[in-house]
Amino acid sequence: MNAARTGYRVFSANSTAACTELAKRITERLGAELGKSVVYQETNGETRVEIKESVRGQDIFIIQTIPRDVNTAVMELLIMAYALKTACARNIIGVIPYFPYSKQSKMRKRGSIVCKLLASMLAKAGLTHIITMDLHQKEIQGFFCFPVDNLRASPFLLQYIQEEIPNYRNAVIVAKSPDAAKRAQSYAERLRLGLAVIHGEAQCTELDMDDGRHSPPMVKNATVHPGLELPLMMAKEKPPITVVGDVGGRIAIIVDDIIDDVESFVAAAETLKERGAYKIYVMATHGILSAEAPRLIEESPIDEVVVTNTVPHELQKLQCPKIKTVDISLILSEAIRRIHNGESMAYLFRNITVDD
């Protein structure tokens, strides 16, 4: 199709190879051309964006992947959205496969809910809609004053399991922590496999029960209202590491939404190996892999790490052959087509469960 006639354009919000590659895959599936723009850093460190064609009255889709430099990527997206708004684009839709700061969506001690701040900034910059994938918390959608389509990668990962893992019927789906149990259960039910949960010291410590905002004064200076006796709480203590479920002689498939702490996945894999699992896979939507991740994965009992291309990880993939990529440009391009044409998005959620 001809993008100029249909009234929409697709732009890449930065010039990194990964973002440009994803944008090109999407435009090829749509039969459109990538919008002409220039995004670069000034010598003083400022980000500059120049739109090189008319966008007046068109639907504009901005593709932005999030590399290691998160803050620069956010500024690129904000400045490009504002430039398109100034150029009289009709609608500005951000295609952000991995939404940054999604782990800061709850109050922690004397911190802030940064994810809500970012949502407000995007709206102020001119975005009118967002397409993203597997938000860390579904409640994040409520931070926005415009529509958010939270697509899911589970159908692609389930297909990978069925087609690329030999003898997957002998596998068991594993939750790395009780927090991930619902997601793991959803995978296990659709694949008709068993379920195991790792509980104990290897679990994620994202929920911090010690909230510093309620720190009491020193006992000698404290004044207690007469008759007020607060119940005493037992100190939080992790139990010894335990695997709930049988993984002996089985293939263990650990599923989660984000891999950003490789050490915890390696620890989980070592535990599963000790319990008798003969092959271990790790699967997640977003692979936020550090510079040390390839070495840690290569030296671990993990046989394969499978992630989608929502986050750039080509360099890490070259360093570690265990890292595999699942392309999700198909669902992103279909979402763009449906939104532009005013079609229902229900088809994209037909195989999705509430726990995905």
Swiss-Prot record:
Read off the lineage from the record.
Eukaryota, Metazoa, Chordata, Craniata, Vertebrata
Disulfide bonds, paired cysteine numbers? none
InterPro entries according to UniProt: Pribosyltran_N, PRibTrfase_dom, PRTase-like, Rib-P_diPkinase
- Carrying Phosphoserine, the residues are 177, 215
- Protein name (record): Phosphoribosyl pyrophosphate synthase-associated protein 1
Keywords linked to the UniProt accession: Acetylation, Nucleotide biosynthesis, Phosphoprotein
Q: According to the lineage, what is the superkingdom?
A: Eukaryota
The job of this chain, per UniProt, is described as: Seems to play a negative regulatory role in 5-phosphoribose 1-diphosphate synthesis.
Q: Which family does it belong to?
A: Belongs to the ribose-phosphate pyrophosphokinase family.
Against SUPFAM superfamilies, the record matches this protein to: PRTase-like
Q: Which residues form the signal peptide?
A: none
* An example Gene Ontology CC term for this record: cytoplasm
Tissue-by-tissue expression: Ubiquitous.
Residue numbers of N-acetylmethionine PTMs: 1
What Gene Ontology molecular function terms does this protein carry? Answer: enzyme regulator activity; identical protein binding; kinase binding; magnesium ion binding
Give the GO biological process terms: 5-phosphoribose 1-diphosphate biosynthetic process; purine nucleotide biosynthetic process
Assembly notes: Binds to PRPS1 and PRPS2.
